[in-house]
């Protein structure tokens, strides 16, 4: 039985849905709430489509897609969550410059039919809770940095007034760290994945929770390259003939918090403290890579190794990942 791909371009209050059949498309706009989700199903049924064959291709726009995705899963629909960068690249490959909500929904449906992206698996309740705790920790960390920066700019006579705020945010972060690890240790699947990730040189207690919430069981990513692209660590090359040859870079999109968490482990690895990565660092140096490029390459390598140990269900092995 063939699938029906439905592209969904979603915003805060509305979403556009489109499915393609016989080289024509049907398009409609719905409200991004429970009533809109019900109307989406009625609209599909009105076109005589079997809902069991539906495959929703939803663009990952902020957190606006989450309610619809969870609703679709609860109604036994197949769902894929697609990085907006992939759709942008796909549109570029087709020579499409127009950008409207309707056009994006059509593109998503076409992309789904062509690529058949991996199915999205909703996080468990404890994974959702872990994600929320990490977001809260990041917020408190930003507040702490802000207070410390503000204190540096204050007169020596009033600096003491910010001490209470600094202590408050510091204590709050300590409490959140305790809650994060208590949750990981008390959740069998999280604890097991954490034990695998902990075997990777350089991956410590601050980085590990971020890897857990992004990678999950790994099934949401087609490959390690897919994960690296999602995290904003995939290299971008700028070369054309002999006249354009820019230094490769990464796209600073995707998971900013994960990149921040991987940065310090990568810096430590770049100093040659871990024998398992010494050959890799040496190869980068021999290729004439800058210190920054080496650190980014190590961040990407740590991420791809993390994906491998979870997908292969076995701890880090120097012989394989060297």
Curated annotation (Swiss-Prot):
PANTHER family for this protein: PUTATIVE TRANSPOSASE FOR IS117-RELATED (PTHR33055:SF3), TRANSPOSASE FOR INSERTION SEQUENCE ELEMENT IS1111A (PTHR33055)
Signal peptide annotation: none
Keyword Cell wall biogenesis/degradation: no
One BP term from GO: DNA transposition
Pfam families from the UniProt entry: DEDD_Tnp_IS110, Transposase_20
Organism whose genome encodes this protein: Moraxella lacunata
Entry protein name: Pilin gene-inverting protein
Protein role: May be the site-specific invertase required for pilin gene inversion. Moraxella can express either a Q or I pilin; the inversion of 2 kb of DNA determines which pilin is expressed.
Source taxon at top rank: Bacteria
Keyword annotations from UniProtKB, A to Z: DNA invertase, DNA recombination, DNA-binding, Fimbrium biogenesis
GO molecular function, one term: DNA strand exchange activity
